[in-house]
């Protein structure tokens, strides 16, 4: 994309670039910024059973530095940040973009996209639990007597975090960037102060150590890779949050602060362990003097809360995209800011995440145990993104097949190796993220498939709208009574007479002066300009067909959109307008095309969906619902 194509990046002043880059430090890099708390410690464990050698320590740090370089810097910062959907990034944004050009393998792309989104939602459960636990565990070094209170303290912090979501975080969000920036600077300073413990650690910049270690260690080398991958967890946030900050601020923050700070800290941890092998039990916190431990624990806890907040917000945003793209049932979405429509709260998602996070903390109890389960969801999401990126460069950038293979195949192979290394931890809790991701994938696939079958079933009994209008406007003794005002009938199929219109005629025997057949569509792009918001077609003197178009990142506020429609010439008084909605009772059918259990599950999801009148922000006192029954 060009610089000007992104809303944040047109004519960007240095001060605006600085503040956006600072903001991205808190939101985009919060997750990856908490990895030093546990990544090196976990990577040491598989090879420390028979003592550590100098070569092993240097090789581990080398693996971490080159993982950050190849996966984060090359794949995400330099490449994927350019693969945007009109400024927006993330798995579902990429899927929406690819659906425009998919040829013959739409179902495969869709399943991949849903799996990527599901893995991200699983990550949104594990990240808060792991990061807060790992930060609070620093209290053991401050006061060993607090060891028994680590889990209760973590639960309280996480509970408060989820409770405040409904109030919005706009008031404190401005501090996220500066606090996280201080966190990175403190980590960098600690790393610098310990590199002098053994300057030999600087040999880790040589990739020879990383490659040689993997070749010589065999099985243990593969196991270690699973822990090494913890250094890049959070990289998906760079792409997912592209729309919030823009490409340049995210890149500047990475190269000027985040990447140097992470590298220096890992080098410092490595040098510390080389000089004092006994510090391998917790090299991150043992880098700091006793007097600094408590302040660092407090700062680490703040950083992990910010990282957790970022991933929770990302989950809310992804769910809204999923709803608008038709992958999830409608849910109640509350806006927590009057000025920023991106700040939302989804109560049902918040509740599910809260239950999941607390369950993980109480089940695993330590960051050591939880870290084993962490990598699978992240590596899985990265593999999915890489495969979809391959399709993107072929379809959107017109890369030849050989060029796409040469550029992306090494990344996919590397990430598959990381995924394989993490799959070795299935029996140690690695099954948890797989179960979570499977559950979310089943939900999204069931909803998508069920709504498609529902649409197909209703189409068989539909009456073409032009034929209906022609018949109803013929004057006869059986013509319905005409009443003043406007009736708006919501329908997903603008070519057919809406069920609500037919039921209204059948039961009430009336027809309004003006009848609007309204269809709401979601575009395969994040936002739609007001001049492109609607399309009006006059079918007859009394019937109009209107299509409202929203971006998948927008609130589908029909009342506001209709105000724009009035300015365009469709005259009606909102206070004398009635909205007619069809309410379908779905009954399972063994011959629906889905297994019976999936039929039942779809009905459960449909019954739990929020009302269309609430989701589309219709005036409550102007809505009429007419029921019908359909077998699916």
From Swiss-Prot:
Keywords: Cell inner membrane, Cell membrane, Ion transport, Membrane, Plasmid, Potassium, Potassium transport, Symport, Transmembrane, Transmembrane helix, Transport. GO terms for cellular component: plasma membrane. Pfam families: K_trans, K_trans_C. It is found in: Cell inner membrane. Its main location: membrane. It is a multi-pass membrane protein. GO terms for molecular function: potassium ion transmembrane transporter activity; symporter activity. Belongs to the HAK/KUP transporter (TC 2.A.72) family. The chain crosses the membrane at residues 17-37, 60-80, 106-126, 144-164, 175-195, 210-230, 254-274, 292-312, 344-364, 370-390, 401-421, 426-446. This is Probable potassium transport system protein Kup 3. Transport of potassium into the cell. Likely operates as a K(+):H(+) symporter. It comes from the Bacteria. It catalyses: K(+)(in) + H(+)(in) = K(+)(out) + H(+)(out). It comes from Rhizobium etli (strain ATCC 51251 / DSM 11541 / JCM 21823 / NBRC 15573 / CFN 42).
């Amino acid at each position: 994309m060009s610089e000007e194509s992104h809303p944040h990046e047109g004519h960007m002043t240095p001060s605006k670039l600085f503040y956006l880059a600072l903001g991205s430090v808190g939101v985009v890099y919060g997750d990856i910024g908490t990895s030093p708390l546990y990544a090196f410690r976990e990577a040491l464990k598989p090879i420390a059973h028979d003592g550590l050698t100098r070569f092993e320590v240097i090789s581990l740090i080398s693996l971490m530095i080159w993982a950050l370089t190849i996966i984060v810097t090359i794949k995400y910062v330099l490449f994927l940040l350019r693969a945007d959907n009109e400024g927006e990034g993330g798995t579902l944004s990429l899927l929406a973009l690819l659906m425009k050009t998919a040829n013959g393998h739409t179902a495969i792309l869709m399943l991949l996209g849903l799996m990527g989104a599901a893995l991200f939602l699983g990550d949104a459960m594990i990240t808060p639990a792991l990061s807060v636990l790992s930060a609070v565990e620093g209290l053991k070094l401050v006061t060993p007597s607090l060891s028994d209170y680590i889990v209760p303290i973590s639960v309280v912090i996480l509970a408060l975090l989820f409770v405040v979501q409904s109030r919005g975080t706009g008031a404190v969000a401005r501090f996220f960037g500066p606090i996280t920036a201080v966190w990175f600077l403190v980590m960098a300073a600690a790393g610098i102060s310990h590199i002098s413990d053994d300057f030999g650690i600087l040999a880790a910049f040589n990739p020879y150590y990383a490659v040689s270690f993997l070749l010589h260690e065999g099985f243990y080398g593969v196991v270690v890779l699973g822990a090494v991958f913890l250094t890049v967890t959070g990289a998906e946030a760079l792409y997912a949050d592209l729309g919030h900050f823009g490409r340049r601020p995210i890149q500047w923050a990475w190269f000027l602060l985040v990447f140097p700070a992470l590298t220096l800290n890992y080098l410092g941890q490595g040098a510390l362990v080389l000089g004092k092998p006994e510090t391998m039990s917790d090299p991150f916190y043992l880098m700091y003097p006793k007097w600094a431990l408590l302040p660092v624990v407090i700062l680490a806890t703040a950083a992990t809360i910010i990282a957790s907040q970022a991933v929770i917000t990302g989950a809310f945003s992804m769910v809204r995209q999923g709803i608008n793209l038709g992958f999830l049932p409608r849910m109640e979405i509350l806006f927590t800011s009057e000025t920023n429509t991106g700040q939302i709260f989804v109560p049902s998602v918040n509740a599910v995440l809260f239950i999941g996070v607390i369950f993980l903390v109480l089940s695993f109890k330590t960051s050591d145990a939880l870290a084993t389960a962490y990598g699978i969801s992240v590596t899985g999401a990265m593999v999915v993104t890489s495969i979809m990126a391959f399709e993107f460069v072929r379809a959107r950038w017109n890369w030849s097949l050989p060029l796409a293979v040469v550029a992306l195949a090494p990344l996919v192979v590397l990430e598959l190796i990381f995924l394989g290394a993490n799959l070795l931890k299935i029996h140690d809790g690695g099954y948890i993220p797989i179960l979570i991701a499977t559950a979310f994938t089943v939900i999204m696939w069931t909803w998508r498939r069920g709504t498609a079958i529902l649409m197909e079933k209703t189409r068989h009994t539909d009456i073409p709208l032009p034929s209906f209008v022609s018949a109803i406007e013929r004057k006869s003794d059986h013509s319905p009574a005409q009443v003043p005002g406007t009736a708006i009938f919501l329908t997903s199929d603008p070519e057919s007479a809406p069920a609500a219109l037919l039921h209204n005629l059948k039961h009430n025997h009336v027809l309004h002066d003006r009848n609007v057949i309204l269809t709401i569509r979601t575009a395969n792009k994040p936002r739609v300009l007001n001049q492109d918001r609607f399309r009006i077609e006059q079918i007859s003197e009394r019937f109009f067909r209107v299509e409202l178009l929203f971006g998948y990142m927008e609130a589908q506020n029909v009342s506001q959109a209709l105000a724009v429609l009035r300015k365009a010439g469709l005259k009606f008084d909102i206070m004398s307008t009635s909205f007619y909605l069809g309410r379908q009772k779905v009954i399972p059918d063994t011959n629906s095309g889905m297994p019976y259990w999936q039929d039942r599950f779809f009905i459960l999801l449909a019954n739990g969906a929020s009302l269309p009148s609430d989701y589309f922000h219709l005036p409550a006192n102007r809505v009429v619902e007419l029921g019908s029954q359909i077998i699916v």
